[in-house]
Amino acid sequence: MPPHVDDVMKLCCELSANQQVKTAVKQSGKGAAAAGGLAFAGGLIGGPLGIAVGGAVGGLLGCWMKSGQFKPLPQVIMELTPDQQARLYEDIVAILGSITWTDVAQLTALVMGNASLQQQVTAALLSYIHKELQAEVHYID
């Protein structure tokens, strides 16, 4: 991986760590299928009351399936494939424009020292995560 790609990935990790962002890859379909499937099965077995019980149990199962799948955004960034990193790199470099840097420390200082640039890079990162990875983004309180 070219050094500049690695620098940009580390910058993205630093920005997301500072803002304490977590992501979850969407798996709502699995939760909905669990709720619907158990509601259907409950209806077959217990009639109208079975639908209610099956739906409630399925909803809890769906919630349990989804829980614990949030990861810190820096971890998600470091787990990107080389192709995904290259696409994210292109998005970020388009914002950085003609800025030149020698190492990740200098790049991080340049971006963190410019609130507007920091906001634009963060927005591009979150947009990439949402669009390309279909992930939910949450800020830790």
Swiss-Prot record:
Chief location of this protein within or outside the cell: mitochondrion
Protein family: Belongs to the C19orf12 family.
Record GO biological process: neuron development; skeletal muscle fiber development
Cellular component GO terms, alphabetical: cytosol; endoplasmic reticulum; mitochondrial membrane; mitochondrion
Family annotation (Pfam families): C19orf12 (PF20721)
UniProt keyword rRNA processing, yes or no: no
Membrane protein topology class: Single-pass membrane protein
Localisation: Mitochondrion; Mitochondrion membrane; Endoplasmic reticulum; Cytoplasm, Cytosol
Annotated keywords: Cytoplasm, Endoplasmic reticulum, Membrane, Mitochondrion, Transmembrane, Transmembrane helix
Transmembrane parts of this sequence: 37-57
Protein name as it appears in the record: Protein C19orf12 homolog
Lineage: Eukaryota, Metazoa, Chordata, Craniata, Vertebrata
Top-level taxon of the source organism: Eukaryota
InterPro entries: C19orf12
